[in-house]
Regions:
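Residue-level signal for inorganic ion chemistry
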Residues: 84, 209, 234
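Conserved AdoMet
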Residues: 1-105
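Extended basic-aromatic, gly/pro-enriched interface segments that bind polyanionic ligands
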Residues: 107, 127-210, 214-225, 247-249
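Conserved beta-strand signature within the Rossmann-like core of class I S-adenosyl-L-methionine
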Residues: 236-244
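Core SAM-dependent methyltransferase catalytic element
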Residues: 251-290
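Conserved SAM-binding loop of SAM-dependent methyltransferases across substrates and taxa
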Residues: 111-129
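A short glycine-rich, Lys/Arg-flanked "PGG" loop and its adjoining helix->strand segment in the class I
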Residues: 224-236
Length: 290
């Protein structure tokens, strides 16, 4: 990829997705966009850029999708899910006993392993959640990964990464070399396309937000804006889970670290003021039909 084409793609990706490519990521652009160019019948990246400049919106969407699809696997990093099971959910069951409703958001959910891991955690609670209204909203910028997530079909390699064998046996059905999540787990998650750069107040408010391993790709200003918007849709006693390499320190004062649980953050009280009701008054968001 030439320096001029690389700079064009950097600006395009920043504007469309917030992805902040450093000056030394040519290898990443080449590894992801050369196959895309060839599928489009083009010799290489130079021709791909030329076609984009000619006004191909469909191709722009494919470029953004190819560059923003990130690695994911079941129960990634394990610790946030341990916190969810052992302390976060039990505390929320007490705090929400009056309205018996929970809303959880998995942002940048990719092919679905994270929201489905959350769903299995909730399913494991059994009778403790009987009679509760539980919503898990999974969002991603990419339509392609959302389609895969909805199907809930995973390869042998995918289910071997992080998924305990007892959960594989309990919640999946094997079909040849593939594994499909059982319908009851799939039904717990609602999938929707969303760009984190845009307003997301229409989602309503949440008790737990997982926004993990995506903010590392944004610059400081973009991160600060996302944190400010996240604070407005998280309940005052809610929990934000970030990735192991992510932090709010030096970026935003909208959240403070939970001193006892690594990777979890609480809204700063002064930053949680917002218009409208809480999660109990939020409209239910249904999976987008396309």
């Amino acid at each position: 990829v030439t320096p001029l084409d690389y700079e064009f793609l950097r600006k395009l990706l920043k504007e469309r997705s917030g992805l902040d490519l450093s000056s030394d990521k040519q290898y990443l652009v080449e590894s992801r966009l050369i196959p895309l160019a060839r599928r489009a019948g083009l010799p290489g990246i130079a021709e791909l850029v030329e076609k984009i400049k000619g006004g191909s919106d469909a191709l722009i969407s494919e470029v953004v999708e190819a560059m923003t699809t990130n690695e994911t696997f079941f129960f990634r990093d394990k610790i946030p899910f341990d916190h969810l099971r052992q302390t976060v959910l039990p505390e929320l069951l007490t705090a929400r006993a009056g309205r018996r409703a929970l809303r959880i958001w998995s942002a940048a959910s990719a092919t679905g392993q994270e929201p489905y891991s959350i769903a299995m955690c909730l399913k494991e609670m059994g009778a403790a959640l009987a009679g509760w209204r539980v919503e898990i909203i999974a969002t991603d910028l990419s339509l392609g990964v959302l389609e895969k997530a909805r199907a809930g079909i995973f390869s042998q390699f995918e289910v071997q990464r992080g998924l305990p064998i007892q959960m594989l046996v309990k919640y999946f059905t094997q079909a040849g070399e593939l594994w499909q999540l059982n319908a009851d787990i799939r039904a717990m998650v609602q999938h929707q396309q969303l760009n984190l750069l845009q307003d997301f107040s229409h989602l309503g408010t949440f008790d737990v937000i997982f926004c993990r391993n995506v903010l590392i790709y944004f610059d400081g200003e973009t991160k600060a804006g996302i944190f400010a918007r996240l604070a407005k849709v998280l309940e005052p006693d809610g929990v934000l889970a970030l990735g192991a390499a992510e932090s709010v320190v030096g970026i935003s004062d909208a959240f403070k670290a939970d001193p006892e649980r690594r990777g979890l953050y609480r809204p700063t009280p002064a930053k949680t003021a917002r218009a409208g009701g809480g999660a109990s008054s939020a409209l239910k968001v249904v999976a987008s039909a396309r």
